[in-house]
Amino acid sequence: MRLKESIIFIGVFSFIVGIFLSLIAVTSHNDPNQYVKIEVQSGDTLWGLADQVNDSKSIDKNAFIDWVTQHNDLASTEIQPGDILVIPVKKEHPFVYQLATVQ
């Protein structure tokens, strides 16, 4: 009976450790993006922001706009001065340092 309890304990323990390690692997993947908050200025558009961020053409402009719209809960693609937006940028991207309004 002790052997059966030991086997069950080892099995449950191994399962829990496996789930824990899987969660660590999933959450610690190397994301090439970072996210910054910016304050929209007069004359800014999502297309203009897409052009500034996407100088390397690493992401489609429409995909960028869709991402920003979805992750900022925007009802449309229109943005207003004073809006605070979270946008994805590549790590070490000069855009992050060029914006005077990075939050």
Curated annotation (Swiss-Prot):
Gene Ontology CC: cytoplasm
GO biological process: division septum assembly; DNA repair; negative regulation of cell division; SOS response
Domain LysM stretches: 36-87
Record carries keyword DNA damage: yes
Annotated keywords: Cell cycle, Cell division, Cytoplasm, DNA damage, DNA repair, Septation, SOS response
Primary localization class, coarse: cytoplasm
Source domain of life: Bacteria
Record CDD domains: LysM (cd00118)
Protein family according to the UniProt entry: Belongs to the YneA family.
The protein's name in its UniProt record: Cell division suppressor protein YneA
Organism of origin: Bacillus pumilus (strain SAFR-032)
Species lineage: Bacteria, Bacillati, Bacillota, Bacilli, Bacillales
